[in-house]
């Protein structure tokens, strides 16, 4: 008599493999990867892209709304403070030493999908 558990286990394993996926690769940016504003694009490409395009050093990827959500909940003043003073892997001034608060606000808005 055929053991019923073997075919059921096989079906379960096939479904498990078929439904699994790399969650990181599934979270693709939802918007453009370069700002429409040329001056913001220049700042982004020079100072932000190297970390935020790839998610280097736990930086939230540009356009990854899910990764940005808990940061945005802290509010713009906290995000600006972290950007200006540095926070965890984020270097002070985000390596944009000629940026001002308005520039950082625009960059954060773009990268967070806002």
Task: Show which residues each predicted segment covers.
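Axial heme c-ligation environment in periplasmic c-type cytochrome domains
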Residues: 61, 82-114
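Bacterial N-terminal signal peptides that target proteins for export
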Residues: 1-8
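Extracytoplasmic/secreted proteins, especially bacterial periplasmic and envelope-associated proteins
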Residues: 39, 43, 67, 78, ...
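The canonical Cys-X-X-Cys-His
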Residues: 44-54, 107, 111
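Post-signal peptide N-terminal segment of mature Sec-exported envelope proteins
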Residues: 28-50, 65, 69-70
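Bacterial signal peptide processing site
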Residues: 19-23
């Amino acid at each position: 008599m055929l053991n019923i558990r073997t075919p059921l286990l096989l079906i379960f394993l096939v479904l498990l493999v078929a439904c699994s996926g790399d969650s990181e690769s599934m979270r693709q940016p939802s918007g453009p990867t370069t700002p429409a504003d040329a001056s913001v694009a220049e700042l982004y490409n020079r100072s932000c892209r190297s970390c935020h395009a790839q998610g280097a050093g736990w930086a939230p990827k540009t356009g990854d709304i899910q990764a940005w959500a808990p940061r945005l909940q802290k509010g713009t003043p906290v995000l600006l403070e972290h950007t200006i003073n540095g926070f965890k892997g984020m270097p002070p001034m985000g390596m944009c030493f000629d940026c001002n608060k308005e520039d950082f606000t625009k960059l954060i808005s773009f990268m967070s999908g806002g």
